[in-house]
Amino acid sequence: WGEEREIAVLFADLRGFTSLSEEQLPYDTVFVLNRYFAAMGAAIEEAGGHVDKFIGDGVMAIFGLQGDFELAKQQSLVSAVNMARALDRLNESLADDLPQPLRMGIGIHAGAAVVGEMGYGSTLGMTAVGDVVNTASRLEASTKEFGAQLVVSEAVLGNTKAEDPCSERHEISIRGRRGMLAVRAYAAATDVIRQTATG
């Protein structure tokens, strides 16, 4: 089956892991990645999200498969906070095994997408395609440009205070998309809790 639905999409990616993995044995790289994926998967599911797929050292998650769009947006933000805290705990437990702490970037966007069972054979699974997915991926990539852990579109945040001290507001262009997209960049993903609690 397939249908159009309003959802929130989250992308997260480890920063500098490729160069980090070159300094480690293959077994150690797999061990660290599996610990990371387990921690991120649990953080996403605890917030009510669906882990769509793991790609390299990144993860894509979908929120809103049950149909509540406002709840989906809130869940995606809670997930980002959960993931940041889970990464901190993971870094503590792996401190003796890593030359430096793991870092990640998270991008979140919300809007209409086509949702359904897609794939082939054993890869068949629930996923989403469309502009909202591409945009969320682009926002994750923009965390590097802004030196932020989290970049989230104002479509997700809703009524955002202009004077929000926890974030920087930017307008960015997305390839294949008309106009500029208003986003908020947070140096620490946990800062979004303060903003949404008072916004």
Name these PLM-found stretches.
Residues 1-78, 126:
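Catalytic NTP-binding/metal-coordinating core of nucleotidyl cyclase/transferase enzymes
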Residues 3, 100, 112, 120, ...:
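Short flexible coil/turn linkers enriched for glycine and charged/polar residues
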Residues 7-10, 52-53, 106, 149-150, ...:
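Residues that recognize and position ribonucleotide moieties
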Residues 18, 60-61, 114-115, 157-158:
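Nucleotide phosphate-binding site architecture
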Residues 33-49, 65-106, 131-142, 165:
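Alpha-helical scaffold within the catalytic cores of cyclic-nucleotide enzymes
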Residues 62-72, 106-126, 143-146:
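Catalytic strand-loop-helix junctions within cyclic-nucleotide turnover domains
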Residues 113, 142-199:
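Cytosolic regulatory/linker segments at or just downstream of nucleotide-handling modules
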